[in-house]
């Protein structure tokens, strides 16, 4: 197959859609993955415009826990990404799409159907988000913890292929940490809007190296100025929020494994011959891995779980919030990339990816 057109990359996140062009270092556009409906005139708004009018719109979230659940609204988001954010005609571009590690096969087929039949794109490439993150790590083998706003997964990848039988969904993500922070702030007497709580979490929270040792340290206290000018002081809550990543059974009241134990369990499900390769490239990806201190804490916890002679390398690139998108951009630079794509002729002949 020879397709002499440019390629665009779209990372379909539950919270944020990221779109841009192959070969670039960062997405051109990032906007909320939401659709707002005006109940009076039935007009629809997407992304930032929907966010700005949220008080008068019914907001809909077409991606839940990483899985597309509303295809009509998802189509609106893709249309917005193509025409409004990037200013491109999809029929003139290869489209690279990310998908959840546990995306149902029927969802993958629906993505192809919309791209070929609605947007008339000449070819597509759909790949597991974790594989894109591995590309961004500079290696082809490793184990990925991808944690965004509403979904977290652990995915071992060997020679560029995800290993589905050892892949796991963690059952908690950034939105759950935001909920936890909201409860902690309520206990302090602060009843704040969710976006403010989220901002506090993202700007001030960090991961402790030893939670029980640090929790009562008075130097933890930090100040945050609210939109009305009031300054509030927050202390141990900043640690307790992020600690949910490692101790979800304490903070979320569940029997879920923390991110460290989930990585260990996933590795143990893989062939013993690749264990060292996986431990040697533990890749952190997604916005909910951006907490300062998470890299050292992960190393510390895995050192206690893995065999004593194991070399553990935590790969936490500073741009890891965009690792999935960047990995897709890197893939598009491979010389034989067009040959790897699924084109319209393939779709017409086989009807499925």
Curated annotation (Swiss-Prot):
Reaction catalysis annotation: ATP + H2O = ADP + phosphate + H(+)
EC number: 3.6.4.-
Gene3D superfamilies the UniProt entry points to: 3.30.420.40, Actin, Chain A, domain 4 (3.90.640.10)
A GO molecular-function annotation: hydrolase activity
Protein's recorded name: Putative actin-28
Native source organism of the sequence: Dictyostelium discoideum
Alphabetical list of InterPro entries matching this protein: Actin, ATPase_NBD
Any single Pfam family the record assigns to this protein: Actin
Job description of the protein: Actins are highly conserved proteins that are involved in various types of cell motility and are ubiquitously expressed in all eukaryotic cells. Multiple isoforms are involved in various cellular functions such as cytoskeleton structure, cell mobility, chromosome movement and muscle contraction.
Enzyme class: hydrolase
SMART domains from the UniProt entry: ACTIN (SM00268)
Lineage: Eukaryota, Amoebozoa, Evosea, Eumycetozoa, Dictyostelia
Compartments (UniProt record): Cytoplasm, Cytoskeleton
Keywords: ATP-binding, Cytoplasm, Cytoskeleton, Hydrolase, Nucleotide-binding
GO terms classed as biological process: phagocytosis
Broad class of where this protein is predominantly found: cytoplasm
Keyword Hydrolase: yes
Family: Belongs to the actin family.
Gene Ontology annotations for the cellular component aspect, listed alphabetically: actin cytoskeleton; cytoplasm
């Amino acid at each position: 197959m020879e397709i002499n057109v440019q390629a665009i990359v779209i990372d379909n996140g539950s919270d944020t859609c990221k779109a841009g062009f192959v070969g670039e270092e960062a997405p051109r556009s990032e906007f909320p993955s939401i659709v707002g409906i005006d109940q009076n005139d039935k007009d629809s708004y997407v992304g930032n415009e929907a966010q700005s009018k949220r008080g008068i719109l019914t907001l809909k979230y077409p991606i839940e826990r990483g899985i597309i659940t509303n295809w009509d609204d998802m189509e609106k988001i893709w249309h917005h990404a193509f025409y409004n954010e990037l200013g491109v005609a999809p029929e003139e571009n290869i489209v690279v799409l990310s998908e959840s590690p546990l995306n149902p096969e029927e969802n993958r087929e629906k993505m192809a159907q919309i791209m070929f039949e609605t947007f008339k794109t000449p070819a597509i490439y759909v790949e597991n988000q974790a594989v894109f993150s591995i590309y961004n790590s500079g290696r082809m083998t490793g184990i990925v913890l991808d944690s965004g706003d509403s979904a977290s997964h652990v995915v071992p990848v060997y020679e560029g292929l995800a290993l589905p039988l050892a892949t796991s969904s963690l059952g908690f993500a950034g939105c759950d940490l935001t909920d936890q922070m909201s409860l902690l702030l309520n206990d302090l007497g602060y009843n704040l809007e969710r976006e403010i709580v989220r901002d506090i979490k993202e700007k001030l929270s960090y991961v402790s190296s030893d939670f029980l040792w640090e929790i009562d340290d008075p130097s933890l206290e930090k100040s945050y100025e609210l939109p009305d000018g009031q300054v509030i002081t927050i202390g141990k809550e900043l640690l307790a929020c992020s600690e949910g990543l490692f101790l979800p059974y304490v903070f979320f009241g569940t029997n879920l494994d923390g991110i460290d134990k989930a990585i260990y369990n996933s590795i143990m499900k893989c062939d013993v011959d690749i264990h060292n390769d996986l431990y040697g490239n533990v890749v952190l990806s997604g916005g909910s891995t951006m907490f300062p201190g998470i890299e050292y804490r992960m190393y510390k916890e895995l050192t206690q779980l893995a065999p004593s002679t194991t070399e553990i390398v935590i790969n936490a690139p500073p741009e890891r919030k965009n690792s999935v998108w960047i990995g897709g951009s890197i893939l598009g630079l491979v010389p034989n990339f067009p040959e790897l794509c699924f084109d319209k002729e393939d779709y017409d002949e086989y009807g499925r990816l």
